[in-house]
Amino acid sequence: MAQKLKLEMVTPAAQVLIEEVDEIAAPGSLGQFGVLPGHTPLLTTLQVGEFSYRKGSDVYYLAVNWGYVEVAEDRVLVLVETAETQDHIDLARAKAALGRAEARLRELTPADKEYHNMQAALQRAMVRIQVAGRGGRG
């Protein structure tokens, strides 16, 4: 059994990272899940949320937006729509987006077409604020 996982994260725009890591935690569509070396093969979907990985005693966080995770032979491939590391999140912009989404949601009902889009925008903003607020490595 390998002692490390090879983590690869890719968006449509770029390769976000390639790292040898000790474990990952991801926001699965059915709930948060973790992967350690020797994990059973897996293919699952991701939702908007906080993705983390640990290298030694350091934990790194990213805000991810929808995607897929494939685990096979101590390799974790993450394909996501967007992924932002802590140091690439503009906290003021994320807070402004949160305010806009909250204000717009107060004007809408669940029957409105835009309602679910605004809920998703709210969730993305909240995750970005959470990840940015980590204040460096965990």
Curated annotation (Swiss-Prot):
SUPFAM superfamilies: Epsilon subunit of F1F0-ATP synthase N-terminal domain. Keywords: ATP synthesis, Cell inner membrane, Cell membrane, CF(1), Hydrogen ion transport, Ion transport, Membrane, Transport. It comes from the Bacteria. The keyword Lipid biosynthesis does not apply. It is a peripheral membrane protein. Its main location: membrane. One of its GO terms (cellular component) is proton-transporting ATP synthase complex. One of its GO terms (molecular function) is proton-transporting ATP synthase activity, rotational mechanism. It holds the Pfam family ATP-synt_DE. It is found in: Cell inner membrane. InterPro entries: ATP_synth_F1_dsu/esu, ATP_synth_F1_dsu/esu_N, ATP_synth_F1_esu_C, ATPsynth_dsu/esu_N. NCBIfam families: ATP_synt_epsi (TIGR01216), PRK13446.1 (NF009980). F-type ATPases have 2 components, CF(1) - the catalytic core - and CF(0) - the membrane proton channel. CF(1) has five subunits: alpha(3), beta(3), gamma(1), delta(1), epsilon(1). CF(0) has three main subunits: a, b and c. Belongs to the ATPase epsilon chain family. Produces ATP from ADP in the presence of a proton gradient across the membrane. This is ATP synthase epsilon chain 1.
